[in-house]
A protein has these predicted regions:
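Class I SAM-dependent methyltransferase SAM/SAH-binding core
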Residues: 1-34
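A short acidic, Gly/Pro-enriched loop at the edge of an enzyme's catalytic core
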Residues: 30-43, 173
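Residues lining the SAM
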Residues: 44-49
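A short glycine-rich, Lys/Arg-flanked "PGG" loop and its adjoining helix->strand segment in the class I
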Residues: 57-72
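Substrate-binding/catalytic lobe of Class I Rossmann-like enzymes that use SAM or dcSAM, i.e.
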Residues: 78-178
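Helix-to-beta-strand junctions that scaffold the AdoMet/dcAdoMet cofactor pocket
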Residues: 21, 51-52, 67-69
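A short His-aromatic
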Residues: 34, 50-51
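Serine-hydrolase catalytic core recognition
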Residues: 56-59, 75-77, 83-84
Length: 180
């Protein structure tokens, strides 16, 4: 796996070691544009929202250049089912600056432009609201401990973020896309 987050890389390495998998997996702190080699399988989960639409051409071109001829690429991200629109102002300001939840039309064109073939598209419209509700429950159960690490303002923002996203998924304003 690759990431620009030292915390993510360290967490993954520790988890792999606990599971006895440290010799079977590799985690690297690197920008995706610098990845070398050829791969049979590439999976991207939760990165497309942070990448931003303006960098999709670069990203998919890179994927195409390192994916073997008969390889498989899975792109999993949160999106919108409506027409392309501006990012949510609250989330863009306080949670994920520069982030965007794209429409399917914003994804397909740059994928096809790079020569990748969209073989399967799935829109997951059930259950993610329940995931966010579970995260909110866990957050609320540990709220005092989290407040000690951050502050009350952060706790209120995070609580609002999780609750509003759960509602957005429940009412189909947000969905999860999986493209292969």
């Amino acid at each position: 796996g690759i990431s620009l987050s030292t915390n993510q890389i360290n967490y993954c390495k520790e988890k792999a070691k606990k599971l006895g998998l440290e010799n079977q997996v590799k985690f690297e702190l690197i920008d995706y544009r610098l990845v070398k080699g050829n791969y049979d399988r590439i999976v991207s989960v939760g990165f497309g929202e942070h990448l931003g639409v303006k960098f999709y051409n670069t990203f998919f071109k890179k994927i195409n250049s390192i994916l073997n001829e008969n390889g498989n690429f899975l792109f999993h991200l949160i999106g919108v089912v409506d027409k392309p629109s501006a990012p949510n102002q609250f989330i863009n300001k306080y949670i994920f600056p520069g982030g965007v939840c794209p429409s399917l039309s914003q994804l397909i064109k740059p994928i096809e432009k790079t020569g990748l073939i969209v073989a399967d598209t799935e829109t997951l419209i059930r259950h993610y609201d329940k995931t966010l509700e579970a995260w909110l429950e866990r957050f609320l159960a540990k709220r005092n401990e989290i407040k000690d690490l951050f502050d009350e303002k952060f706790c209120k923002m995070w609580e609002f973020y999780l609750a509003s996203c759960a509602a957005a998924f429940r009412y189909r304003d947000l969905v999860v896309f999986q493209l292969q």
